Each structure stands twice: as C-alpha cells, then as structure tokens.
Design a protein with these regions (language model features):
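Feature captures the catalytic ectodomains and active-site-proximal regions of enzymes
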Residues: 1-285
C-alpha cells in the first residue's frame, strides 16, 4: 500500500511550493525539486491523471519520480489541499460526502447539498461553504499581498460553492468549455502580468470512469492534453516554471463489495457511511 508522503513528495507539499513562490510564509516542507529561484509558478492539474496511466500513454517513463496525492484522494479533498496549503485533517473536507455535525446531515461536497435531496448549493442559504469548513485559500492570501493570480477552470463549475474553496472567489477567473479554449486562456494568462497561473482540466477523469484508466480513449486524451500544455508552456519557460500534476490516479476495480446487503453490518451504523468509494467513514454503535 502506498501512503501519502507529506514530508516532501505529495500534493500537499506542492501546495507549500505554491505558497513559497508567491512570497507567502510557510513553515512546512516544499517539493525540493521546485527551486525558489524567482521564477513564477504555473500549475496544471489534470484530474485523474495517474502515474501508471502516464507511463502507458507514453508521457512518463518507468522510474520517473512521482509525488503522492493526499488521503482521502478524492477530487474535493485533493483540490482543497492544493489551494489552501492545509492538510485534509485541517480543512476537514474528507471525501465526496461528509457528515457535518453542525448541520446534522451528510452533505454532498461536490454539490453542497444534503445527500438525500436535490438542489445544487441549497445549503448556501444556511451557511456558505467557505464559512462551514473555514478553509484557508492561497489565492486570497496572495491577492491581499498585491499578487495577481489567474484561475482557469471549466464553465460547468463556475460560481459553485465548491469553487469558492478550491478556486477561490479572488483573483481573475476564466471559464472554458473545451480543451481548446482552456489552452487559449492558459496561453493568454502566461503572456499576462500574473504571479501565479492555475489551470484545472477534468477530461481524463471522466474518460477513466467511463472506459477505464488504461483504455485507449483515456490514454489518447492524456497524451493530447499533456503535449498541448507543454507546447504552450515551453514558450514561457523563461518566466514560468510549469508543473503538470493530478489530484489522484485510477486503478481498474475488481469485485465490488455491496455493504448495504449485509444486514448485520447495517445494524451497527448510527448514521449511513460517508466519504467516498476509496475511503469510507463509519460511525458505529
């Protein structure tokens, strides 16, 4: 089993490198391979772009160094860690769903609503997500210090409660519909007077879920995305150091365990399980 390496080789440590590149104070380990030499930092996060898939796609070689994700490694937890500089146990967004004692419900963190209801961001009427979790945000900290940040993300998550703590409500935001306009905005941001540029790309994760992580559609997507990002980034390497990374990878699943079919197990729960399929939390009697 592979554990997160929080001492210098994890997504958490990349968050510390971002903080350092913006001239903000941090007391926690950074990624040593990213020198603090005055270059600005550009981070491109490809959702679901795992190390093994990268090797099979031909964009990584066997033996290349890698960093780990965080635990839990689901997108919500990983992205918030990356953009807050907080460990999962500090920001407390521990999966796709979380039991929030203050509200007395299990909430869907992607849609910020109770899991058994409909209505995206409906809990905003009770308390904003940013206030519920009290997450720090590196973009907000940097902007207060006079830094300029560009955040490029898909249109379908624009103005959602989740993006207030993953992308921040500060900085300059650019929404895109497909990879091609994402790369356009990315190039424009690198050409602009920004101190930090962040691009989030979800496509590989979607294809991994539909076709499998090592399917040709997903491997071709990884190849195309990585090569396209590199073509843009190389023209700006004198000013920006570009890091292409991921929130997590994927593995091919074997047998699924349906815990709901075990009546004895169900009877021990005080509330339904929450978290995610890769990291389930139980509250038992």
């Amino acid at each position: 089993m592979l554990y997160p390496d929080y001492e210098g080789r994890s997504l958490y440590n990349l968050s510390q490198s971002i903080i350092t590149s913006l001239g903000l104070p941090t007391r926690r380990p950074v990624i040593k391979e990213i020198p603090d030499d005055g270059k600005k930092l550009s981070v491109v996060l490809i959702d679901g772009f795992g190390y093994r898939a990268g090797i099979k796609a031909g964009v990584l070689a066997e033996g290349d160094p890698f960093i780990t994700s965080v635990f839990p490694s689901i997108t919500t937890t990983a992205l918030i860690t990356l953009m807050s500089g907080q460990m999962p146990g500090e920001h407390c967004v521990l999966g796709g769903t979380t039991f929030v004692k203050k509200l007395g419900v299990i909430i869907d963190n992607f849609s910020y609503m109770p899991v058994y209801t409909k209505g995206r961001d409906s809990l905003k009427e009770i308390t904003p997500m940013k206030e519920l979790y009290q997450v720090e945000n590196t973009i907000e900290r940097a902007e207060r210090e006079g830094k300029k940040c560009a955040i490029i993300s898909p249109d379908f998550i624009k103005n959602s409660e989740l993006t207030t703590i993953t992308n921040s409500s500060s900085g300059n935001h650019f929404s895109y519909y497909h990879l091609w306009d994402a790369l356009y905005y990315y190039r424009k941001a690198l050409e602009g007077d920004y101190d930090f540029v962040y691009l989030y790309i979800p496509f590989a994760d979607k294809l991994s879920h539909f076709y499998g992580p090592y399917s040709e559609p997903n491997l071709e997507a990884i190849r195309s995305i990585v090569e396209a990002v590199k073509r843009v980034a190389v023209d700006h390497r004198s000013r920006f150091r570009t890091v292409i990374t991921a929130d997590h990878g994927h593995v091919e699943a074997g047998e699924a365990i349906q815990m709901g079919e075990n009546a004895n197990l169900r009877s021990t729960f005080t509330i339904p399980p929450f978290g995610s399929t890769r990291s389930i939390f139980f509250s038992g009697k």
